Amino acid sequence: DFEYLQLVLTWPASFCYANHCERIAPNNFTIHGLWPDNVKTRLHNCKPKPTYSYFTGKMLNDLDKHWMQLKFEQDYGRTEQPSWKYQYIKHGSCCQKRYNQNTYFGLALRLKDKFDLLRTLQTHRIIPGSSYTFQDIFDAIKTVSQENPDIKCAEVTKGTPELYEIGICFTPNADSMFRCPQSDTCDKTAKVLFRR
């Protein structure tokens, strides 16, 4: 089984600076994934490999809005669902005893809905277009995550770490917060760019 769930939210402006996006980057965090994991050993591609069922209707629309497949043109993304399928087989497989495909994606949407990280950052005067210390970003997010979040950076331009993703962790049944293990991708001594 697994010890915690990490909801990973991507900042699209940074993602689309580092990757080629077919979708217009929304000005808010979008879901990258919901990752069941253990503190010591990383879990992925668990057996048995689940079968992915394609979403339609309301669930498709909700995912398209809140878990945007930024790299893919919208019609292709909605039909082929490459990002969701990949995430489900890689990560959803590791909590399939507890969550089936519908409950897994439903849970990710429900957990994302608990937080407005952009508003939280803005409340703490952390605004897209400027740079901030790692600690300032960490402390702002911790006001809503209660336990330690995992702030993830990417250094697309050498010497300029930028805020890329934020992980918020939960207990396996998602009823309380869990202290995220730290991925240590941010230079704690440098200013971190919050890309506009």
Curated annotation (Swiss-Prot):
Positions glycosylated per UniProt: 28
Entry binding sites for RNA: 32, 69-70, 90-91
Enzyme class: lyase
Cysteine pairs bridged by disulfides in the record: 16-21, 46-94, 153-186, 169-180
Gene Ontology terms: biological process: RNA catabolic process
Presence of the UniProt keyword Lipoprotein in the record: no
Catalytic residue positions: 32, 87, 91
Subcellular location: Secreted, Extracellular space
InterPro entries, sorted: Ribonuclease_T2_eukaryotic, RNase_T2-like, RNase_T2-like_sf, RNase_T2_His_AS_1
Any single GO CC term annotated in Swiss-Prot or TrEMBL for this entry: extracellular region
Catalysed reactions, as listed in the record: a ribonucleotidyl-ribonucleotide-RNA + H2O = a 3'-end 3'-phospho-ribonucleotide-RNA + a 5'-end dephospho-ribonucleoside-RNA + H(+)
GO MF terms, alphabetically ordered: ribonuclease T2 activity; RNA binding
Keyword Transmembrane: no
Pfam families noted in UniProt: Ribonuclease_T2 (PF00445)
Function: Self-incompatibility (SI) is the inherited ability of a flowering plant to prevent self-fertilization by discriminating between self and non-self pollen during pollination. In many species of the Solanaceae, self-incompatibility is controlled by the single, multiallelic locus S.
Quaternary assembly: Monomer.
The name this protein goes by in its record: Ribonuclease S-F11
